[in-house]
Amino acid sequence: QQPVLRAEQLHHGDAIGVVDTDPASKSYGRLIGQTDFPQGDNELHHFGWNACSSHLCPYAPHAHTERRYLVVPGTHSSRIHVLDTKANPRQPELIKVIEGSEVHAKTGYAAPHTVHCGPDGIYMNALGTPDGGGPGGIFMLDHQTFELKGRWEKARGPQHLSYDFFWHLGQDTMITSEWGTPTRSGSSRTCSSSARPRPPRRSPAWRSP
C-alpha cells in the first residue's frame, strides 16, 4: 500500500486529501482530490465539522445550519483552517485561515488539538498557552462566521492539562481528559527531546456554564 499523500508531492508541506470510499468505483481507496494549504508548519490534527447532532438536536434546534465546513486545527502553528466541502467535495475550498497569533490573543491558548460541534458553537480544545506551558483548555468559535468567541471555562479549578473532551448534553456535563502542555507534547517550537508528557491521572468533569 502506497501512501495517498506523498511528502514530495506537496508544494507547501500540508494538505487535505480526499479518498474514494465507494467500493464499486474504479478509484476506490485512492486519492481523488487534494487541497494544499498556504503554509507547511501546522501539524494538522483532529479536525471536525461545523455542525452535527449536538447543534441540530432538540436541545439546540438549528435546522438551517449546513454540515459542510471542515474546521482543521494545527497544534504546531496554532492556526485554524476552514474548508468548504459543498461546491466540490473532491477538492474542498480553503475559505478562512485564523492565524495562531489571533488564537493566542483572543483565547490565551495555543496548540489547538480537537474539534467538536456543540449546541451553541464550535468547541475546540487547546493543549496549553502561547509560552508552551499551561493550563490548556477549551475555546469556542461561531458556527456561521467562524469568529473566535473566547474561552469556554468560567471557573477552572485545579485543571491544568488538556487533551480531548465530550459531553452529556442532557446533564449539562462535560468530561475532559489530560495529556501534556505544548512543550511536553511536542506541539511547541521550543520542545526538547527530553520533554515528555506526564501520564494522565485525572479526567475532570465540568458543569456547563
How should each PLM-predicted stretch be described?
Residues 43-66, 108-119, 165-172:
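Structural signature of eukaryotic scaffold interfaces centered on beta-propeller domains
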Residues 1-10, 57-68, 72-73, 125-135, ...:
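Short, conserved, GDST-rich strand-edge loop motifs in beta-rich repeat architectures
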Residues 85-169:
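Asp-box/WD-like beta-propeller blade repeats and closely related beta-sheet repeat scaffolds
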Residues 155-162, 166-209:
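Beta-propeller domains
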